[in-house]
Amino acid sequence: GMPIGKTAKLDWKKLIADTGLKVVSIHEDLGSILRNPQEIMEEAKTFSTKYIVITGMHRFDYSNMAAVLELAQKLNKAGKILKEGGISLLYHNHNCEFRKVGAGKCAYDVLIEKTNPEYVNFEFDSYWATEAGVDTIALMERLGERMKLYHINDRGTRMSGPGGQILKSDSMELG
């Protein structure tokens, strides 16, 4: 979930080339996209990917309707800029987007409804939706073609100690 280069001083391009792997997407933060869209698009192109994924907002109140509406607006703006450069913007969920913001709606509902499918689509993470108690199959059906990537991992049942604001239980290693 960290932007490239923030996880140590590794030569990611060389590592990827040496292993023959393909980069499906890169993660970026919304502020960087809005401040430096050309730089971000060039980075995506150097990895031969068409997807830039925003993995949520740090210290963001997903229970605040005005804030969520503003987020949708900013996502649309960033997505439009990226689309003009041949890149697609995806939003990756965690459990916090499923907090209620009003009458029967959660923040994720608002993001689906208020973002333009031409500019913003989704990398759906079923682990976090399940953690939030969401009917993941129904939500995947609702997203339909807007679900461009699917992030799947095993869901643990052990409770963990202190962690970030998102994590509530341990994930389990696949395999």
Language-model segments: residues:
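Acidic/histidine-rich catalytic cores of soluble enzymes
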Residues: 83-175
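Active-site acidic/histidine proton-transfer and metal-coordination neighborhood
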Residues: 22, 28-121, 142
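A short alpha-helix capping/helix-coil boundary motif
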Residues: 17-22, 56-59, 161-165
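Mobile, glycine- and charge-enriched loop segments
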Residues: 13-26, 145-147
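Short, contiguous strand/loop micro-motifs
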Residues: 1, 26-28, 64-66, 98, ...
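Glycine-rich, proline-tolerant flexible connector loops at the mouths of alpha/beta enzymes
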Residues: 1-17
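Short beta->alpha connector loops
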Residues: 2-6, 28-35, 57-58, 127-135
